[in-house]
Amino acid sequence: MIKRLATFALLAALLSPALAFAQALTPGVDYVEVSEPQPLDPLNGKIEVVEVFGYWCHYCAEFQPLVGAWKAKLPADVRFTYLPAVYGGDDPYARAFYAAQGVKGLFARSHDAVFRAVNTSRDLPRNASVEELAGFYAQYGVDAAKFAQAMRDPKLDPKLARARDFAVKVELPGTPTMIVNGKYRILGNSYKDMLRIADQLIAKERKALR
């Protein structure tokens, strides 16, 4: 009897990941449907996953190692996009995000480091100025004065407005938030649960494309 129970326990342990993935998604619990669905960018046959985040968000900093590893393993038909959370006013961190994307390789080198500087080492305050951020990014090979100028460039204004509009459209409740194809805003009860739900919604959208 004990041997049989042990066998059942082993089988349950082996099957539990598959069962968790196969668990049917529940609207209102696992995700909500966006009332006016629209992807951030044209899909062109891709499945879009957007993570709305803030460098000043402690939860986003906790989520980043998980979502970064998950993103690295996504198949070619999935397009992952980071999108800074822009609320009412201007946000220097959002401007720094877009300015960093304008310099080849800078975003990849600095993204995780900004999270750590704000949320772990406290080298950057949550309400950092343009000058403070430019000085930080200078550690990664850019001229601080030129980076500050790039952050203030009016050409970034439409990008911030676009991020703000997207947040309104998906009724952003906070950060981090993941949205699939502009249609599904992921809920979940943990960071890993958010990724589980994302995987299933990606599979759902992939099936719909066939």
Annotate each language-model stretch with its function:
Residues 62, 68, 72-79, 101-105, ...:
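Sec-exported extracytoplasmic/periplasmic mature domains
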Residues 60, 90-93, 126, 160, ...:
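Alpha-helix N-cap/helix-start motif
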Residues 2-5, 54, 138-210:
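C-terminal cap of thioredoxin/glutaredoxin-like
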Residues 74-103, 107-138:
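Structural microenvironment flanking redox-active thiols in thiol-disulfide oxidoreductases
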Residues 55-59, 86-90, 116-121, 156, ...:
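Solvent-exposed loop/turn segments at secondary-structure junctions
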Residues 64-71, 93-97, 111, 130, ...:
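Extracytoplasmic/secreted envelope proteins and their assembly/folding machinery
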Residues 2-89, 168-169, 205-210:
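Extracytoplasmic thiol/disulfide redox context detector
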